[in-house]
From Swiss-Prot:
Residues 192-211 are annotated as: Disordered. One of its GO terms (biological process) is proton motive force-driven plasma membrane ATP synthesis. This is A-type ATP synthase subunit A. Pfam families: ATP-synt_ab (PF00006), ATP-synt_ab_N (PF02874), ATP-synt_ab_Xtn (PF16886), ATP-synt_VA_C (PF22919). Its EC number is 7.1.2.2. Component of the A-type ATP synthase that produces ATP from ADP in the presence of a proton gradient across the membrane. The A chain is the catalytic subunit. Belongs to the ATPase alpha/beta chains family. Residues 196-211 have a biased composition (Basic and acidic residues). CDD domains: ATP-synt_V_A-type_alpha_C, V_A-ATPase_A. It is a peripheral membrane protein. Its main location: membrane.
Amino acid sequence: MSQTEQAVREDGVIRSVSGPVVTARGLDARMNDVVYVGDEGLMGEVIEIEDNVTTVQVYEETSGIGPDEPVRNTGEPLSVDLGPGLLDTIYDGVQRPLDILEDKMGSPYLDRGVDAPGIELDTEWEFEPTVSEGDTVESGDEVGIVEETVTIDHKVLVPPDYEGGEVTTVKSGEFTVEETVVELSSGESVQMRQEWPVREPRPTVEKKTPREPLVSGQRILDGLFPIAKGGTAAIPGPFGSGKTVTQHQLAKYADADIIIYVGCGERGNEMTEVIDDFPELEDPSTGNPLMARTSLIANTSNMPVAARESCVYTGITIAEFYRDMGYDVALMADSTSRWAEAMREISSRLEEMPGEEGYPAYLAARLAQFYERAGYFENVNGTEGSVSAIGAVSPPGGDFSEPVTQNTLRIVKTFWALDADLAERRHFPSINWDESYSLYKEQLDPWFQENVEDDWPEERQWAVDVLDEESELQEIVQLVGKDALPDDQQLTLEVARYLRESYLQQNAFHPVDTYCSPEKTYLTVTAIHQFNDEAFEALDAGVPVDEIISIDAAPRLNRIGVQDDYEEYIATLKEDIATQLQELY
């Protein structure tokens, strides 16, 4: 919402300033109204009203403003601009396009109070109508298509708060987002641009049970702990365990139609990496640039704290907008802990009663409000779309018992626990298979059986059983050593090692291994399973375990991930393993 566009009223003055929290007196405002604070017009939002005193959280640095400066009310809630131009763009936490602000300022250093619309108002888009005069449309119905990027067709919808009616006028050609393209008998006119309050979920008909996986291209996620399209997942882990790289991998290779990446309070150089890498990378499903399906929201750790609180809502509102068009959207929030810390700071400045570890008592409610906006929905126009929410959590010291992790755990259905010990051993992605879980496995099995292989659930369960047995045996090994174990248990440890090194480990920086299709994931585990079965046959025939594990073909299991022509490689490898083991007896 641009300051220049709003009919702002100078109807209040600053009473006090405490960091990002400003109190004003004489301000005629409602909860969540957007206001402009001080002579420079810093954007803020009303968060508390008591008698004649209004409390505002300011989304910019407040140094230098003081008492009796004006506070102007817009009378509108914090909203985002929705329309063509959202993709291939980078925003700050309140949807100001950073590249446009840089051009406006002539400098990468932005002044306070500078503003710009969320989508460019002067750009003309080719509008192709999908309705004719005389057709009847309701709220949410599609009236036309705009080619937003080479990957995504932007569907122009009747806004959800419109009554609808008979189409009286339809235009075709190039228009700006504010020009009317369709007129209705109700007197309403449809433009390509909509506004929507960020804290209000967009309406749907029904939330449905997800049945299709969000294929990530990461073997451990797709194979052992899958997330559904419309699912929720948390990635908690200590510093340096790989949360951000895992989020980047999901943003690059997840088979969603649209990616919304929210950098919430994390390091600036990590967002820089995204901005540098994504334009050069190809979307594996279309071959087009990744940025053509991506919108970035950057609110790094050196940006104002209050804007962290809004950036997550900005991201999920944009995600819901594309969901209404029938697209599958994946939202990455990195990290929800920084969002919670922003809530804690503002709560403490408001002198609210603190909850556990100083977080506000409403922490669980806010987290639930965010994650519950994810899901697989039937939209009001009859299409189906999904929003998958994947939030990184940064518990101090890797302590999963802290409030943000525990409250997130109660809400999400997929838990990918990152492990500092695995990261120190250079096992990446460092997802601990003993602590992680997915509650979507059973409902996604029919999809994997239909689209990959019938015995997908059995192969997954076999891998889980071997890894569980290894965890139990490791405790004995640490006490008495590996050589003291019986031969069959030594062989189990060797099979588990191949599972860890060739199935669970994956090199995010290798051009081939960075992405693994479900078919390749399945064939990898079947190759290790065959080695297991043939090796135990040889062991039963009296072959010493040392000879079994030292065959030449076995180490080639660790090279499956980097093979481009993996089907032929795995078929040859299976034959060689069988031949070499049978030669031993």
